[in-house]
Amino acid sequence: MKRAKHQDVFAERLPVKAVPEGKQLRKLAGDWLKLRRADAELSQADLAARLGLKYYTFISQVENGFSRVPTEIMGAWASELGLEPAPFARHLLMYYEPEMYRLLFGAESK
């Protein structure tokens, strides 16, 4: 019985627009990633090859907000763009998991 009450309380706190907002934030992350890739003077195909990805279209999916940078290759992605992995991951966390970002770094941190 207690468990059901806990689940009910949790369900009441879920954001109603989680999916559309999430897609919008992924698109903003993708725009940022596209700018960083352009700064590094890499095409989508170049970056995909350097990351060992089979299809360059995955880069397009990420940049257009349809997918996220996988955690397993986040460090390599940062390095290929000439960025430090920790700040890169932190910046993406702000888009991919805004509530987790707020809990870890505070609302004012960017």
Language-model segments: residues:
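Recognition helix of helix-turn-helix/homeodomain-like DNA-binding domains
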Residues: 52-69
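Short, basic-rich loop-to-helix N-cap that marks the start of a DNA-contacting helix
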Residues: 65-79
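Key DNA-contact positions within bacterial/archaeal DNA-binding proteins
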Residues: 45, 56-57, 86
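Residues in the recognition helix of alpha-helical DNA-binding motifs
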Residues: 36, 50, 61-62, 91
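Short, charged recognition helix plus adjacent turn
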Residues: 3, 79, 87-110
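A short, Lys/Arg-rich alpha-helix, primarily the initiator
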Residues: 3-39
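Short basic helix-loop element that most often maps to the first helix and adjoining turn
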Residues: 30-50, 76, 108
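Core residues of bacterial helix-turn-helix
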Residues: 40, 51-52, 62, 81
